[in-house]
Amino acid sequence: MAMKKANKLTQTAMIKQILKRCSSLGKKQSNVYGEDENGSPLNVPKGHFVVYVGENRVRYVVPISFLTRPEFQLLLQQAEEEFGFDHDMGLTIPCEEVVFRSLTSMLR
């Protein structure tokens, strides 16, 4: 009886270890939007955020200070009108990349 109980405990411990390894594997992977398991974008410096621009949804990292600029706020209004903010695509700016790069270079 004691042997069966010890064997059962060992199996339980092994199963827990396997489950722990499986769950930690998922944490190391990112999703298609380059986000970690908490939904935070990878490789984004503090004080910045990610936007996706144009038809090809090219990823740009921009400073948070842009949020106070009226020019950038217009882009956000366009994004809200076209996509809304309740979707799984990340913050998408509906303008051509050339226009976006030009605007952001002026804002810097």
From Swiss-Prot:
Inducing factors: Induced by zeatin. Repressed by abscisic acid.
InterPro entries on file: SAUR_fam
Compartment(s) of residence: Cell membrane
One GO CC annotation: plasma membrane
Entry superkingdom: Eukaryota
GO biological process, one term: response to abscisic acid
Tissue: Expressed in organ primordia. Hardly observed in leaves.
Alphabetically ordered keywords of this record: Cell membrane, Developmental protein, Growth regulation, Membrane
Record's bilayer topology term: Peripheral membrane protein
Keyword hit for Cell membrane: yes
Similarity annotation: Belongs to the ARG7 family.
Function: Provide a mechanistic link between auxin and plasma membrane H(+)-ATPases (PM H(+)-ATPases, e.g. AHA1 and AHA2), and triggers PM H(+)-ATPases activity by promoting phosphorylation of their C-terminal autoinhibitory domain as a result of PP2C-D subfamily of type 2C phosphatases inhibition, thus leading to the acidification of the apoplast and the facilitation of solutes and water uptake to drive cell expansion. Triggers plant growth probably by promoting cell elongation. Regulates branch angles and bending.
Protein's UniProt name: Protein SMALL AUXIN UP-REGULATED RNA 51
